[in-house]
Swiss-Prot record:
May act as a double-stranded DNA (dsDNA) mimic. Probably regulates the activity of a dsDNA-binding protein. It comes from Erwinia tasmaniensis (strain DSM 17950 / CFBP 7177 / CIP 109463 / NCPPB 4357 / Et1/99). Belongs to the putative dsDNA mimic protein family. InterPro entries: dsDNA_mimic_put, Put_dsDNA_mimic_sf. This is Putative double-stranded DNA mimic protein ETA_15890. It holds the Pfam family DUF440. It comes from the Bacteria. Gene3D superfamilies: dsDNA mimic, putative (3.10.450.140).
């Protein structure tokens, strides 16, 4: 993989959020979809992190943080606060030529 061909942090967040929006209705409880849509402007956010260690239970490849990121999407207590109600954890490959993502949805 090429370090010079990676998505920026903003591009990674945007791509993960777009994927979340496309798939949320099919994977979240309808009440959670309504809550997220009503509260996102006031309390919503997406946070970029290195992949958590528990992803190893879900995927069978090396999660080098130079090429993979975890994006938490959900609601915080207030605008700008850390996300406390996680609706999705998106594992995404940051290499532009390698489209790959996995999502763990709120249960």
């Amino acid at each position: 993989m090429d370090l010079n061909n990676r998505l920026s942090e903003d591009e990674t967040l945007e791509q993960a959020y777009d994927i979340f929006l496309e798939l949320a209705v099919d994977n979240l409880d309808p009440a959670d979809v309504i809550l997220f849509n009503l509260q996102f402007e006031e309390r919503g956010g997406a946070e970029l992190h290195d992949p958590a260690e528990d992803w190893a239970e879900h995927v069978d490849f090396d999660l080098n943080p130079d090429f993979f990121a975890e994006v938490l999407i959900g609601l915080g207590e207030a605008d700008g606060e850390p996300i406390t109600d996680v609706f999705a954890r998106v594992l995404i490959c940051r290499e532009k030529d390698h489209k790959l993502c996995h999502i763990l949805w709120k249960e």
